[in-house]
Amino acid sequence: MEGYDNGSLYAPFLSLKSHSKPELHQGEEESSKVRSEGCSKSVESSKKKGKKQRYAFQTRSQVDILDDGYRWRKYGQKAVKNNKFPRSYYRCTYGGCNVKKQVQRLTVDQEVVVTTYEGVHSHPIEKSTENFEHILTQMQIYSSF
C-alpha cells in the first residue's frame, strides 16, 4: 500500500484508540445520564450490561468476510441509512464465547470492508491462517464507537 513503511509489521495500524468511559462533567454523578451523539444512556446501565470493547478494521478486499482464524455464524443483516451495502452480523461459534462482529462495505470506496469486533475471545484461535500477515498489512485499526 502507498505511504506505508513496508519494513514494519505494524505500519498499517494508523490509529488505535482504546474504549474509555465517558467523562462526567462537574456536579454529575455516575448514575446520571450522559448525552452522546444525539442519544442518551445511563452510564450505570451500560456497566450492568457489561459493555464490551469494540475494534474496527478497514481492509481493502474483494470479499466481505476475511479469514481471521475464528469461526462465525451469521445471525442477521440489515440495510443501513445512507449506505447501499447492507451490514451483516456474526457471532463466534465457540461455546461460551460471546464475541460478535459486524461487516459492511463503505459507500465512498466500495473496495473497503469495515469489520467491527465487539468483545474478546475466551478461547485460543481455532485455525491458523497462512494469509493472516497479508491481511494485517492491509488493515487500519479503529476503536471506540
Swiss-Prot record:
DNA-binding region(s) in UniProt: 61-126
Disordered: annotated segments: 20-55
InterPro entries: WRKY_dom (IPR003657), WRKY_dom_sf (IPR036576), WRKY_plant (IPR044810)
Lineage: Eukaryota, Viridiplantae, Streptophyta, Embryophyta, Tracheophyta
Main location: nucleus
Name assigned to this protein: Probable WRKY transcription factor 75
Location(s) in or outside the cell: Nucleus
Keyword set, alphabetical order: DNA-binding, Nucleus, Transcription, Transcription regulation
Role of this protein: Transcription factor. Interacts specifically with the W box (5'-(T)TGAC[CT]-3'), a frequently occurring elicitor-responsive cis-acting element.
Highest taxon of the lineage: Eukaryota
SMART domains linked: WRKY
Pfam families per record: WRKY
Nucleus keyword on record: yes
GO biological process: atrichoblast differentiation; lateral root development; negative regulation of transcription by RNA polymerase II; regulation of response to nutrient levels
A GO molecular function held by the record: DNA-binding transcription factor activity
GO cellular component: nucleus
Compositionally biased spans, kind Basic and acidic residues: 20-38
UniProt record similarity statement: Belongs to the WRKY group II-c family.
PROSITE patterns: WRKY (PS50811)
